[in-house]
């Protein structure tokens, strides 16, 4: 036992810290400190001379060996070493399964991520800008119409692409949380998920059933070894032992070295075994109560979380006249009656100004514009054809005749055309 190395078993048990609860970490501490260290350090020095110092009051050859075998069928130290190995076996098997499961899950996540990346749709190309207006056309005046919404903003992004990006980020976060070995605290997760307890992490990794199974196996082994230790050694080491086995000629008395020290050490190992069994039971109760609380919380209705602010309803544009259509990706904007009257008055004032300019230049023989009011027109010449009575409030008549004698501004403002302002396309009617 002096040359026995515990480094491999110790390193293996330390890996269990990464995938166990807080109570499981306490159990592992008790196992390493009070069992492995005590057995390796204290047991070797106490039981090193247990057979050499075991003497009997006879000189019969072989009687000492036969009586020692009857006193201790299995050495205390070897019994405790075997107990440590057997009780640690379920935890080691659980660790192997957990490592295999997590490695396989990470590989599956990488495959799914690689399949999702080529299937993403390319981002939409920007809409082509409309052609620039004619150099001679002025920019249309701001008549108060609402701007059409033609561009696709961030909120209109393809939901499939956004969903794929979100899944990739979630997979990367999950892989990073699983790859964090010794730290069971999930960074950035408030509440019970970010606490020191690793129960939620075991649930997230899908290892709860295997973890409970290894707890049950450990508890069963603890009970079995406690019963076996009592049947083999009892609760004390007697200072002498009466032996009547062959080849002893008669009943001989054999004496044990350091019986009190060995009795204390035996009782300490009893206490450690009972403590480990109690920790196993507490851990099973902790997992059961935690799962029950999660089930109760899951049945309760969740409080309404403050969501995003509701969007205001879109402003309804004036209805377009029946029979009018617009190309795709264009919005049809119709002027209101107030805007029409204001523009007609502006056209009338422009026509009156043009007539005054012609009179100043001496061109009095030309008939006035049909869009002028009645009081602004001169007396008609005899024999001249009667001009049509154009209404100043008729947008179509003024717009139709404004192309003949009025400036290009009137035609561009009244006629049906398209212009570009701030990169957005608007159809004016």
Curated annotation (Swiss-Prot):
Residues 47-78, 236-263 are extracellular. Residues 372-395 have a biased composition (Low complexity). GO terms for cellular component: connexin complex; myelin sheath. One of its GO terms (biological process) is response to toxic substance. Its main location: membrane. It is a multi-pass membrane protein. It is found in: Cell membrane; Cell junction, Gap junction. A connexon is composed of a hexamer of connexins. Interacts with TJP1. This is Gap junction gamma-2 protein. It comes from Bos taurus (Bovine).
């Amino acid at each position: 036992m002096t040359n026995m190395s515990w480094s491999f078993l110790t390193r293996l048990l330390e890996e269990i810290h990464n995938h166990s609860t807080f109570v499981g970490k306490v159990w592992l501490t008790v196992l390493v400190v009070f069992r492995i260290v005590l057995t390796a350090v204290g047991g070797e020095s106490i039981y090193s001379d247990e057979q050499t110092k075991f003497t009997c009051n006879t000189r019969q050859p072989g009687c000492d060996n036969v009586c020692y075998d009857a006193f201790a069928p299995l050495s205390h130290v070897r019994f405790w070493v075997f107990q440590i190995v057997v009780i640690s076996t379920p935890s080691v098997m659980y660790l192997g399964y957990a490592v295999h499961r997590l490695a396989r899950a990470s590989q599956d996540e990488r495959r799914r991520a690689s399949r999702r990346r080529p299937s993403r749709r390319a981002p939409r190309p920007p809409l082509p800008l409309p052609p620039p207006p004619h150099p001679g056309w002025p920019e249309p005046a701001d008549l108060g119409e609402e701007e059409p919404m033609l561009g696709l903003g961030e909120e209109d992004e393809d939901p499939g692409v956004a969903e794929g990006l979100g899944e990739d980020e979630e997979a990367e976060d999950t892989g990073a949380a699983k790859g964090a070995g010794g730290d069971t605290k999930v960074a950035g997760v408030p509440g019970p998920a970010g606490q020191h307890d690793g129960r939620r992490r075991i649930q997230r990794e899908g290892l709860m059933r295997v973890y409970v199974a290894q707890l049950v196996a450990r508890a069963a082994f603890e009970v079995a070894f406690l019963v076996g230790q009592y049947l083999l050694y009892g609760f004390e080491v007697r200072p002498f032992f009466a032996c009547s086995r062959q080849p002893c000629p008669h009943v001989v008395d054999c004496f044990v070295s350091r019986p009190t020290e060995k009795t204390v050490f035996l009782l300490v190992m009893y206490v450690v075994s009972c403590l480990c069994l109690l920790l196993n039971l507490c851990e099973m109760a902790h997992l059961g109560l935690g799962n029950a609380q999660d089930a109760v919380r899951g049945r309760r209705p969740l409080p309404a979380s403050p969501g995003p602010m509701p969007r205001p309803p879109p402003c309804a544009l004036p209805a377009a006249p029946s029979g009018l259509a617009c190309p795709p990706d264009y919005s049809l904007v119709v002027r209101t009656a107030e805007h029409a009257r204001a523009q007609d008055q502006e056209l009338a004032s422009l026509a009156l100004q043009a007539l005054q300019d012609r009179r100043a230049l001496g061109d009095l023989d030309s008939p006035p514009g049909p869009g002028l009011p009645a009081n602004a027109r001169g007396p008609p010449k005899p024999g001249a054809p009667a001009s049509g009575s154009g209404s100043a409030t008729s947008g179509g008549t003024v717009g139709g005749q404004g192309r003949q004698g009025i400036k290009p501004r009137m035609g561009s403002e009244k006629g049906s055309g398209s212009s570009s302002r701030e990169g957005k396309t608007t159809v004016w009617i």
